[in-house]
Amino acid sequence: MKRSKAIAVYLLGTFSQIVSVCLLFFFLNHFSVQSNLLTVLGIIVGGISSALWGIIVANHYFHIHFKKIIKDFFNIHTSYKHYLLSFFLIILDFSFLMFGGKIIEFSWYLPFLMFFKFIVFGGIEEIGWRYVFQPILQEKLPYFHSTISTFFSWALWHLLFFYIDGSLTTLQTLPFLFGLLTNSFILSALYIKTKNLWICVMTHSIINVLSQLTVDSNRYETYLLKIFVILVSCYMVMHKKDEYNRYK
């Protein structure tokens, strides 16, 4: 499979699948059809689209078999430095808590339950976006351009998914997109530095958990902090000499 075809297959497959679910939900809503089962199935089918087509393209373009993808997804046995790097960026991303941000009250076990939930509904996305799509882009594009391109595709995918799960109407679009842009740089930098899919999955899940349990009191300070996180991520990649070793 050629590079251009791999990109086309991934994007067309991913968006055809999730748009089809959106259209189904549009007609269900139009005719006032309510079904919890269809809602759950729609969330599952739409939610796995990026991962499913990532697996397909990984197999045909990178020749990575399904068993290897699953092994990489749960590859927790990696250098402690990789975990420290992940925690460093997460702490940096949520450092607004030191400047007036608040933590919502919750039961002690809730973050653990949410973490495992977000591995399935969140972390699994990393198979498509960081493990397959952006590495293909990086064969021809610099890190910054490929990350921005991935962000736009990932953002559109999220907006479609939020239409399916019903949260689009209450979404604070600008803060969400700014956060997603920051996450795009964090996760792509982590994958380039660690070459470990699990680190991206774990980081994605932790970010989702903390996003649900924290509130920023000063949005402008939060934006400045996120810009700083993006710059740090870019700096990390600029000093990674073997950035494209996997793809050569």
Task: Identify what each model region corresponds to.
Residues 2-16, 37-47, 61-94, 138-146:
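Interfacial transmembrane-helix boundary/kink motif in multi-pass membrane proteins
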Residues 8-61, 108, 112-113, 222-230:
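Alpha-helical transmembrane segments in multi-pass membrane proteins
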Residues 15-23, 90-98, 119-121, 152-161, ...:
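Aromatic-anchored segments of alpha-helical transmembrane domains
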Residues 22, 172-229:
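Functionally important transmembrane alpha-helices
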Residues 60-65, 237-248:
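Membrane-interface capping segments at transmembrane-helix boundaries
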Residues 103-115, 165-178:
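Juxtamembrane helix-entry segments on the extracytoplasmic side of multipass membrane proteins
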Residues 124-151, 192-196:
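Membrane-interface helix/loop boundary segments of multi-pass membrane proteins
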Residues 128-137, 165, 202, 211:
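Active-site-flanking alpha-helical
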